[in-house]
Amino acid sequence: GVDITAGYRSVELMKQYVARTMNEHCIGGLGGFGGLFELDCTGYKHPVLISGTDGVGTKLKIAMIMDKHDTIGIDCVAMCVNDVICAGAKPLVFLDYIACGRNIPEKIAEIVKGVAEGCVQADCSLVGGETAEHPGMMPEEEYDLAGFTVGVVDKEKILSNETMAAGDVILALPSTGVHSNGFSLVRKIFDIDANPDVLHTAPAELGGKTLGEALLAPTKIYVKPVLKVLEEVDVKGISHITGGGFYENIPRSLKKGCCARINKADVRTPALFQLMQKTGNISEHDMFNTFNMGVGMVLTVPAEQADKALEILHANGEPEAYRLGVIAEGEGVELC
């Protein structure tokens, strides 16, 4: 059956990490039937709550093979909070859900350590979670991880692309690597399932890192720099570049009749993606249709405010943000 003692031990071990995320709006502590958070509406005329949920996908298999579980939680938080900031919202709270074959307290605590670190980076509170042990349903050493966030934005400040027009500038916020999408293809490219030891090799292209280390680089959390830009710049659209790459995600923030025109030579693609393309003999179109290609998020701003937006990004944790392309008349994404 379920190991209740292990469950109690997990909670004790994770408390120190959860405590890092608490602020004056959190009411009570761990152990309640729900997480309480006092919403401060000061500064909001008409506050609107926005929610998001996501997981980490099969990147978890890389973490399991590498036996490294302390950053995968950052990925989980990032996948959720990066989505809600696309509406202009500030994340407030986060909850995690871990399903496992066997509750190994030290491993669970490492996972939650990463979740807590992600919450600190996103300036939100980890107000609850669930660890579900599924003996007989999942292999003992395996687990799955999902997360849920709630954010707030003033109704009049919900991002709208209504004024987007030809000539607007598209800015790129670099990724840390593959982030948390496309790992089923990554595993196929390097034949990881059949040859897991390949993760411990260090291809010359990766500058001394092993393949496993490069693939496990946690998804970047863009909350703080983007919120700073939103305070001073008329941002017309934000896209989180996840599964589906450029072709699926950039159009989600485009106004009808507008297209994103991007020169492929301007995309600063890290060596990891070049290694993947070469090893898997993957077409350029499929790479841009699957992976972020080194761009984790894009912001569309008026041309006259592009320099100001870049200055803010450079001063707030995104020193490598750059101009990626422009808005033109048309539909979708034009990579030329």
Locations of the language-model features?
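N-terminal amphipathic/basic leader segments beginning at the initiator methionine
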Residues: G1-H25
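Residue-level signature of catalytic and energy-coupling elements of molecular machines
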Residues: D3, D54, G167, H240, ...
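Short, acidic Gly/Pro/Ser/Thr-rich loop/turn segments
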Residues: G7, G43-Y44, V56-K59, D154-K157, ...
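Hydrophobic face of alpha-helices
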Residues: V11, A109-V112, F183
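Glycine-/charge-enriched secondary-structure boundary and capping motifs
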Residues: Q16, K107-S125, M138-L145, N195-L199, ...
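Glycine-rich phosphate/pyrophosphate-binding loop regions near the starts of catalytic domains
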Residues: Q16-T176
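Short loop/turn motifs at secondary-structure junctions
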Residues: G88-K90, L185, D234, E320
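Short, acidic (Asp/Glu-rich) active-site segment that either coordinates a divalent metal cofactor
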Residues: D144, K157-T210
